[in-house]
A protein has these predicted regions:
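Alpha-amylase-like alpha-glycosidases and glucanotransferases acting on alpha-linked glucans and related
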Residues: 1-13, 38-229
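Conserved, well-ordered alpha-helix/loop/beta-strand core segments that scaffold catalytic motifs
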Residues: 10-37
């Protein structure tokens, strides 16, 4: 069974490489998204249980999420296993270096989801019904990204700033993505706006309800392809 899934990954990689090469030949860069966490049943957790907060039976001791806020009164319980950051530190962040290296094999630019989790991450006891019982823990911070940069060189990274962004998170963004002397206003000139995210409906949904015919018609014509969207 493992060999079967390895073969599927091989075929996907083969086809994706052809697609990326073609896109790049047309002057198109591909932006890829990397989630900060992996799933409990992922190949990463299966092959490297010691890098995650798992017990002797590979059951999580704490899981990921975010605290209660204006979006949810009980917070968000994602359920992903958390990292043992001290183990990652002791190995020179090699797993993360390899992960980022492969991302840049797939994409030209990498967007890191939940970037604030590298500064502080929310830890929720395993088995909790909501995220309300969780607490903040300190993440690896700039140390991780310095290790990645030393191994891979300076790469193009987009840091997601969704959710509560503390001063320490903003400092982490400035320290890694920009030189220390970069003016604050230059930071915001380099921002990228996305029309949607994973928890939102696609942008076509509100467009279908627009009542201004010219704007609605022109934009819908632009984003539609054939009979689909």
């Amino acid at each position: 069974e493992v060999e079967y899934y390895k073969y599927l990954q091989f075929k996907f990689d083969e086809q994706w490489s052809k697609l990326k090469t073609y896109a790049n030949s047309k002057g198109i860069q591909i932006i890829g998204d990397i989630p900060i966490y992996v799933a409990l049943d992922s190949a990463d957790a299966w092959a490297n249980p010691g890098l995650f907060q798992l017990d002797e039976e590979n059951i999580p001791t704490a899981v990921a999420g975010v605290p209660p806020d204006g979006f949810s009164a009980t917070g968000q319980l994602w359920g992903n296993p958390l990292y043992r950051w001290e183990v990652h530190r002791n190995t020179g962040y090699q797993w993360w270096i390899t992960r980022m290296w492969y991302c840049f094999e797939l994409y030209d630019v990498v967007r890191i989801d939940h970037f604030r989790g590298f500064d502080e991450y929310f830890s929720i006891p395993y088995g909790s019904e909501t995220a309300a019982s969780g607490h903040w823990e300190k993440g690896p911070g700039i140390e991780l990204f310095r290790a990645v940069e030393q191994a891979l060189g300076k790469r193009e990274i987009i840091a997601e700033d969704l959710g509560y962004m503390s001063d320490t998170v903003r400092k982490l963004v400035r320290d890694y993505l920009y030189d220390y002397a970069t003016p604050e206003e230059q930071l915001y000139k380099s921002m990228i706006a996305l029309v949607l995210r994973s928890a939102a409906a696609t942008c076509i949904i509100p467009m279908q309800d627009w009542t201004i015919p010219p704007a609605s018609t022109n934009l819908l014509r632009l984003v539609k392809t054939g009979d689909g969207v």
